[in-house]
């Protein structure tokens, strides 16, 4: 009698525990997939949407991690519909991780070689480190962001002999920016923004090249619209003259996974890092997550240029790595 009454109780408890674990696993997977789906859906819809989507889009490749974790939960829970959901998300992420934009070599004859370096020196703190890198690497054009008054004075004192031509926007904190050049420069209006974005026209061995420094505001939660507007102004500047060779370089505070940045590429500009096979190399935050970060510093070039090598150079005293690329300018066919 005692044995007969005990058996159903033991059987019922044993059957309930696996079902609870499966429901828990399926719930965890659904939460992970739902979050990833929002970001991937915005990427597919070509929109940066609202916070927190722009911030998460910067790290889109790393969404593979929660997606893979969710897929593991679905397998443990034997939730096959969820497994299909996870596989679809993995496929979409793999598709979007591929390089965006045009590639290919120019068709005209080569006419000039030049090296371009861009660096965000974080409120001028890395000015001395930048001077060392510039002296070692000897770029022809240097785009410097967040170069406040002390930084500007340092660059004038240390680099004027090697870079006699400059175009700058003076400012404190993050507002100052400067373009240094071995080639003669003629200043242009630049692009209006909260932080300085000077522009110039360079005479590169007798060939006209448009130069524009990029430094739009970052997509902080309270200023996503401002970030989009300033990237839009850079897009308009890029589209204003597609026939003249152009270099647009700086801290864009955006990756290829942001719709506002892709619209700049859609004007015909190409990312030199992508052309040289380094399109996903992180540049920020270089001090805290150097291998898990995002590529937000770029050298964009028009179809007149070929990029042979692009390197990401860590600098002390700043949270951005510098980007150095070797370019060949080709004449129109």
Each language-model region and where it sits:
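N-terminal, active-site-proximal structural segment of metallo-dependent hydrolase catalytic domains
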Residues: 2-157, 331-333
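Soluble catalytic domains of enzymes that build or remodel membrane lipids, polysaccharides, and related
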Residues: 116, 122-135, 144-333
